[in-house]
Amino acid sequence: MKFVLLFGVLLVTLFSYSSAEMLDDFDQADEDELLSLIEKEEARAKECTPRFYDCSHDRHSCCRSELFKDVCTCFYPEGGDNEVCTCQQPKHLKYMEKAADKAKKFGGKTKKWFG
């Protein structure tokens, strides 16, 4: 009986140690993957096209605003045959960002009142 109990304790100890090692390996892999994604995002962010600049060379290169990514909008100027593309923020997204800013400001005021 003592042998079975000792063997069980040894088995549980080895199992918990091996699972802890596997979790550490997974955590390390997740951290490495996250860091590589952040580096890629930073590199990509440097190449974005600012608002109201020409985006005809790459229509997916518009920069992000605070919450949303700007959209490459193309149009024909009055009296012209050439298409012009610029990065712009759609109006509905502009209004949503303004509402979010007001909600943040209001949230800060309520914290001061009820703090």
UniProtKB/Swiss-Prot annotation:
- Provide the coiled-coil residue spans: none
Lineage top rank: taxon: Eukaryota
Question: Entry's InterPro entries?
Answer: Spider_toxin_CSTX_knottin, Spider_toxin_CSTX_Knottin_CS
Residues spanning the signal sequence: 1-20
PROSITE patterns on file: SPIDER_CSTX
One GO CC term on file = extracellular region
Which of UniProt's keywords are assigned here?
A: Disulfide bond, Knottin, Secreted, Signal, Toxin
Anything noted about its domains? The presence of a 'disulfide through disulfide knot' structurally defines this protein as a knottin.
Name the protein family.
Belongs to the neurotoxin 19 (CSTX) family. 01 subfamily.
Q: What is this protein called?
A: U3-lycotoxin-Ls1d
Q: Which organism is it from?
A: Lycosa singoriensis
Top-level taxonomy: Eukaryota, Metazoa, Ecdysozoa, Arthropoda, Chelicerata
